[in-house]
Amino acid sequence: MTEKKPLNINIQSEIGGLDAVLLHTPGAEVENMTPKMAQRALYSDILNLSIAQEEYAQLSGVLHKLAKVYTVSDLLVKVLDNETERQALIGKICVMEQVTDYFDMLMDMPSARLAKVLIEGLPAKINTLTSFLNEDYYALFPLYNFYFTRDAAVTIGNNALICKMANRVRTRESLIMEAIYKGSGEFSCGIINAYDYQPGNHDIYMEGGDILIARDDILLLGNGARTSTQGIDLLTARLGALVSEGRRHIIVQQLPHKPESFIHLDMVFTLLDRDKCMVFEPLILGDNQYQTVHITMENGKVVKINSVSNILSVLRRLGMDLEPIICGGESDEWDQEREQWHSGANFFAFAPGKVISYARNTHTLDELSKHGFEIIPAWDFIEGKASVEGDKRCVITIEGSELPRGGGGARCMTMPLSRKPVKWE
């Protein structure tokens, strides 16, 4: 019997043909929330789980037809089946979340049950005065945001970056992702764990929605509420240590901390094709107070840092001449703001010129149609009524009345693991 080889992690762009992707279907963790807990959970509203799952089934169904799909739950069970990996992960979680008295209980659970608890939450034992008076219902809080698999870890080249999240409520996501990359046996990659560097420095944090790979030598980073300048400095230093030869470019876009729809760069800018991108015009192209900074690296060292007019201007100088397509359309700023709020700029490319987005952002879709993109409803593609073959540009649309309430779109909900190389010329 031939031994199964692990998948080599390889992401050199945002648009290369998708070979493998990591997903997590929203489950009971999303429903284990009250309106009072929504803010702590980083939600603007509570979700209707059954509708959210129906919408997510469209995204999952599309991706199952396009690439190999891995799921967080299945991989986590594989990790927990290994006693050494189980002990390491549960130990880290118990120490990080200050619940060491639950260690033995968690270790005794069957793997499938334990995986469920780690994601959906564990109610606290009421057996002391402290626990009786504690207002928190959970010892381990549900991972409300885990269906946004993009944020807790990032694949860059042949490496997985384990992100140090901006909010402690999401720390367990990063621990689980590290365990999956290290201990599931499914992947072959280098690992950069941001928690290993200056662990006491709370000013260091970054999330995957702020990290876009424009080209193998160009990284786009957002600097806002979820990714700090110190986090970017750490990422720059670690990547410099890994890639010690040649010239590399890091382009940093400052972001507003409010409103919450600007939490990540991919909420205002995503790549669609070799020569096209989706932008929220007021921030990316308009006159505003938010800087765009170009960091040039030579042989792993920073040699120049300078301000530039915008992302597109510096990409053009680097040989990527991108035509901007405007989120919400070109004519009405209200439409732009409304559709950006519901992840109208957040696209996931599964091949050059072939993307996935929400169906609700009609003005954005009209703008894409004007630029030659065929609009394909998800179920038409899943059921074989429409094709994405050939050179045509297309956007597959999924329903999105509940999923956007969590604060993200198609790119946020996908963690690409392997893509084909892009022929740039």
Please place each PLM-identified region on the residue numbering:
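The feature marks the mature, well-folded catalytic cores of soluble enzymes
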Residues: 2-425
